[in-house]
């Protein structure tokens, strides 16, 4: 702040010296053009100095009005509508400071937004990756369990069919042998009774076949019940996993809300910092005004000593 003000004051003093030198050259030319008619009278010089002093006082009033203005637009309009060395310099300094502060704030805000976005993106990708891996593991385990159950059911079914076939053949052959042995021992009971025995044997075979079919159906039902129980257990596990996923999603949503809240807090901090920078700019303008006023007062006090040195050569 102090270094910048010293540069500004140096520029102001250089401009004043340059203006004084130009005025001295003008007066020298006027003296030469008068062709020995003498120097300007002290009255004319005093008028010139008074005009210059009035010009400076007018510019100081404009600067005072700029500092007491209620808004930035009003200040800029005052500086634009009243041209002058001091006003132009103050306007250029103010615009430069505003541009630098705005650029710094924009860069800081972009960096913070970029950092928050990258962090949020990385966390989201990590969560998606974990969810995909867990889903693949569950699908693979479910497929493996299903294949194992299918193989086990096929093995049990083939064994049951083989056992039933062997049992049916053994029973059929035993009944047939007993009937033939009874006929051979006691003789033929007659054609009628022989037909009755054949019919009874046929009915017994039908009943046995029905019992076998019902047994097979009962075994299938038992297998289906076991399968349903297994599927029910898998369903409960899937529901539990879904509940775990729901809890994780809620945690992720709360994390996202927390990140959003932190972003809003950072935005508020940036706004407060912007207001503080504007306040510092106003204080800087007030200090610049006081410094210029003090320098102009000092230059006004030394003006009478400058007049004789410029007139004496003639």
Swiss-Prot record:
GO-annotated biological processes: spindle midzone assembly
Protein name: Coiled-coil domain-containing protein 69
Molecular-function GO term, any one: microtubule binding
N-myristoyl glycine-type lipidated residues: 2
Family: Belongs to the CCDC69 family.
Cellular localization per UniProt: Cytoplasm, Cytoskeleton, Spindle; Midbody
Species this chain originates from: Danio rerio
Its biological purpose: May act as a scaffold to regulate the recruitment and assembly of spindle midzone components.
Coiled coil: 106-291
Disordered: annotated span: 1-43, 114-133
This protein's UniProt keywords: Coiled coil, Cytoplasm, Cytoskeleton, Lipoprotein, Myristate
Keyword check for Transmembrane: no
Superkingdom: Eukaryota
Keyword Cytoplasm belongs to the record: yes
Gene name in the database record: ccdc69
GO-annotated cellular components: cytoplasm; midbody; nucleus; spindle midzone
Main location: cytoplasm
